[in-house]
Design a protein with these regions (language model features):
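N-terminal accessory targeting/assembly segments
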Residues: 1-106, 116
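Charged, amphipathic alpha-helical linker segments immediately N-terminal to NTP-binding catalytic cores
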Residues: 103-141
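Conserved small/polar residues in nucleotide/adenosyl-binding loops
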Residues: 143-145
């Protein structure tokens, strides 16, 4: 028999206190099934569970509509982006060019923004500015029991 174990705990350190609080308030049985956390600047916090998107409020309630769900700010996006890159963007050129970085526990943080190209390197992606959204994919461990 195989059991899946979520590695969501590895992304808590990346999240801002407000976003972390909302995610940690989701009941554990649902929280462990989260596959993605979606953060879009100026839009509502959402999570994906079994390919279905839910919005999350401050109390961790999962909702099918926006309702009183948490609104993601520019500060949330910038802080989480910087934490994913350990405040050292210049050390991660390859990851920036790919559009995602693998963080602790095998989780991935994908990002969307405006590419800054380097003409000296055949217009390779040098950096990304104006980050507008982040998608955190939660890794799973398969445990044989």
């Amino acid at each position: 028999m195989i059991r899946e174990v979520s590695k969501i705990k590895y992304v808590y350190e990346l999240l801002t206190p407000r976003i972390r609080g909302a995610i940690m308030s989701v009941p554990e049985i649902e929280r462990d099934r989260i596959q993605e956390i979606r953060l879009r600047r100026g839009r509502r916090l959402s999570v994906t569970i079994f390919s279905k998107e839910y919005f999350v409020n401050d109390n961790g309630r999962l909702m099918n509509n926006i309702g009183d769900s948490v609104q993601v700010t520019t500060e949330d996006i910038e802080t989480i982006y910087q934490r994913a890159f350990q405040n050292s963007l210049h050390s991660f050129h390859r990851e920036i060019a790919r559009g995602y970085i693998t963080v602790s526990g095998g989780c991935r943080v994908g990002f969307c923004g405006t590419a800054v190209l380097d003409p000296a390197r055949s217009y390779a992606v040098e950096s990304v500015k104006n980050i507008s959204s982040l998608n955190i994919r939660i890794a799973l461990s398969l445990i044989h029991i």
